[in-house]
């Protein structure tokens, strides 16, 4: 009798790991993008929570005037934020080991870079994971394409804008009031409200909300009755049923008569593509606009564009907006510079002519 002893193949462990990572039978799909997504998002989330609760003040402007952002240093949920890295750091990569001490790293806002860079890698991988799962299931890739809009927006405010401005201190703070401060300063310095790409983004977001509400209300109003008056209409739908749950002809007829015939879709597929494409394209344009304004190609300037026959300026809303911009810029970093850049660049006329 001969006994054959075969060495266990070490490749089996790797093959089992590959099958587990790419299996669509798992409760949560991991995927190869998920292998990188999970640790990066966990790192960003953990550091954000710790920094939001207890990070010391950060010298954001690089002028030895630290700004407090954490809860333990006097802030609340509304005013709290992870303060961006110091202007003294600029665009330098600033991991913990580049600082002389942990205190220096915290003082210069190192956690902001750690959170933002890990977060961006994580959301990029999440988008890739959406594509990967769609591929495994034989689906089309439009879920990942739609998700690319908020990914592009996050990349614009957290990475592209700081690169264009020359410092991570110009990035968006990670907090509620910090976000509003970022928006006001962005308007003051770049006149974003007068940029056509931002206007397309507003149309995309508000239009998408309107179309979503219209579609949902039309479907809900034209459900095919499958229940009695005493039962909930939701019980009339069975998951996976083949027949339609609402009457698209009735919805089409109603909407066509409410506005006009060709305002209503008669194809469910083209309708849902439109509902997805409208806000996505709008947010794409907004992200592109922020990326353009990052390099100071700003919104339109119509200040003092209308004058009467005597040469006197006839004020418009553009002039009102310009005055508001100057006021916001005066208040921004008021200890870092004395005047808004727009005023400082203007040649001062002498008070007395000789």
UniProtKB/Swiss-Prot annotation:
Enzyme Commission number(s) from the entry: 1.10.3.9
Main localization of the protein described in the UniProt heading: membrane
Transmembrane segments: 29-46, 118-133, 142-156, 197-218, 274-288
Disulfide bond positions: none
SUPFAM superfamilies in the record: Bacterial photosystem II reaction centre, L and M subunits
Details of cofactor binding: The D1/D2 heterodimer binds P680, chlorophylls that are the primary electron donor of PSII, and subsequent electron acceptors. It shares a non-heme iron and each subunit binds pheophytin, quinone, additional chlorophylls, carotenoids and lipids. D1 provides most of the ligands for the Mn4-Ca-O5 cluster of the oxygen-evolving complex (OEC). There is also a Cl(-1) ion associated with D1 and D2, which is required for oxygen evolution. The PSII complex binds additional chlorophylls, carotenoids and specific lipids.
Annotated site residue numbers, Stabilizes free radical intermediate: 190
Highest taxon listed in the record's lineage: Bacteria
Keyword DNA damage on entry: no
Subunit-level organization: PSII is composed of 1 copy each of membrane proteins PsbA, PsbB, PsbC, PsbD, PsbE, PsbF, PsbH, PsbI, PsbJ, PsbK, PsbL, PsbM, PsbT, PsbX, PsbY, PsbZ, Psb30/Ycf12, peripheral proteins PsbO, CyanoQ (PsbQ), PsbU, PsbV and a large number of cofactors. It forms dimeric complexes.
Further remarks about this protein from its record: Cyanobacteria usually contain more than 2 copies of the psbA gene. 2 of the reaction center chlorophylls (ChlD1 and ChlD2) are entirely coordinated by water.
Protein name in UniProt: Photosystem II protein D1 1
Originating gene: psbA1
């Amino acid at each position: 009798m001969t006994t054959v002893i075969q060495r266990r193949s070490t490749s089996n462990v790797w093959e089992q790991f590959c099958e587990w990572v790419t299996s669509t039978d798992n409760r949560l799909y991991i995927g190869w993008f998920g292998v990188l997504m999970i640790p990066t998002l966990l790192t960003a989330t953990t550091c954000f929570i710790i920094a939001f609760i207890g990070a010391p003040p950060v010298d954001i402007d690089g002028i030895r005037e630290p700004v407090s952002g954490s809860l333990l240093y006097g802030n609340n949920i509304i005013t709290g934020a992870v303060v961006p890295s110091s202007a003294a750091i600029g665009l330098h990569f600033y991991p913990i080991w580049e600082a002389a001490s942990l205190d220096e790293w915290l003082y210069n806002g190192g956690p902001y870079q750690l959170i933002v860079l890990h977060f961006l890698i994580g959301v990029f991988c999440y988008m890739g994971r959406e594509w990967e799962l769609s591929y495994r299931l034989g689906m089309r890739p439009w879920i990942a394409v739609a998700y690319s809009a908020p990914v592009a927006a996050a990349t614009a405010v957290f990475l592209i804008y700081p690169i264009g401005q020359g410092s991570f201190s110009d990035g968006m703070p990670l907090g509620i009031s910090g976000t509003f401060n970022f928006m006001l300063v962005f308007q003051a310095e770049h006149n974003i409200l007068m940029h056509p790409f931002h206007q397309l983004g507003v149309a995309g977001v508000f239009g998408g909300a309107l179309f979503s509400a219209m579609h949902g209300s039309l479907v809900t109003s034209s459900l095919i009755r499958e229940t009695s008056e005493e039962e909930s209409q939701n019980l009339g739908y069975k998951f996976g049923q083949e027949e339609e749950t609402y009457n698209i002809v009735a919805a089409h007829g109603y909407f066509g008569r409410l506005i006009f015939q060709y305002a209503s879709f008669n194809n469910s597929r083209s309708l849902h593509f439109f509902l997805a494409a409208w806000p996505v394209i709008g947010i794409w344009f907004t992200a592109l606009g922020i990326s353009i304004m990052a390099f100071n190609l700003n919104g339109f300037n119509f200040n003092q564009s209308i004058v009467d026959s005597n040469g006197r300026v006839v004020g418009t809303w553009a002039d009102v907006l310009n005055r508001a911009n100057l006021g916001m810029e005066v208040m921004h970093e008021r200890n870092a510079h004395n005047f808004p850049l727009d005023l400082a660049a203007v040649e001062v006329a002498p008070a007395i002519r000789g």
